[in-house]
Amino acid sequence: MNLVQRAVEQGGKLAPIVFTHDLTALMNPSIYIDNGGDILVNVRATNYTLYHSENKQLFPSPWGPLAYLHPEKDQRLITENYLVRLDKNLEVINHTKVEMLNLHTPIWEFVGLEDARLVQWDNKYYIIGVRRDTTTSGQGRMELTQIDIDKETWTVKEVNRDRIPTPEPDTSYCEKNWMPIADRPYNFIKWASPVEVVQYSPEIKTTKQVSLKQGIRPNKDQRGGSQLVRWGDGYLSITHEVDLFKNYLMQKDGIYRHRLCVWNNNLDLVGLSKPFSFLDARIEFCVGAAELDGDLLLSFSVSDNCAFILRTPGILVEELIVEALNYEN
């Protein structure tokens, strides 16, 4: 299913996120509506772009159907973050680069805070993503990055950063794509099958496992994903699943698809839609969701080089919920 087509046919809207910036590509936007009603989006900007040969893949790059294109003299994959404010028509009003604290010298080739989800907890704004540049092996941990937003001058600065450990033992290689629960401060869905809920304590810098229980058993790993946002008596989120493989020439390739997840108030996964695409591209990624006037705003990117907001009509969301609640593996 092409979700954009269905949404637009039912009165929804697809809006690109476009603004001037210092790097090469805009990707993986995370939308959030704050306590004051402002529609905010954190957008990842990178110094590279992704080329992916689509459809029948008649025009691969010299390196295969999927290739990262970056400066020849700097093969690092660098990320910066921008904060954008939209009006209700989903047009860009303001944008600015997030000024990050200079706390360390990056020592791995993935540089910066990647795929950050935007939330407001305890009246503080956070962008929460993975950072992999603090060790020579590229170990990844989610980081809780507190930002201060001056809405008069439209400037944004990082004011505090916590590197979030996993529940003991904190020995895994790469943690990423935890899904923040929008109205439960410092709580995340770490895994979807079984559902693992974890809570980080900023005061003592530790993470505990809140619960671990099996809900629906997806036939593919469901990975984050957007925030969990309130919808009726429960929550909705978007997860992704991916097939990573090599083609007949042993060149790497991949296909990403998404699903709508339905959660009850106890954070049980009770519904899972059929897989869908946004725009029928093979490489797509959704990291943001927000409710606006009964509709669901979804922020996503295509091929790591263009960012969009999809206003999904509430009637279509309800259709997807019915489908999800009737999930059969």
What are these model-predicted stretches?
Residues 1-24, 33-108, 120-220, 230-282, ...:
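Beta-rich carbohydrate-recognition and catalytic domains
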Residues 26, 112-113, 284:
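Short, surface-exposed coil-to-beta transition loops
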Residues 276-277, 289-297:
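Well-ordered alpha/beta subsegment
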Residues 106, 113-116:
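Short, charged beta->alpha transition segments
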Residues 28-30, 115-117, 177-179, 225-227, ...:
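Conserved beta-strand position repeated once per blade in WD40 beta-propeller domains
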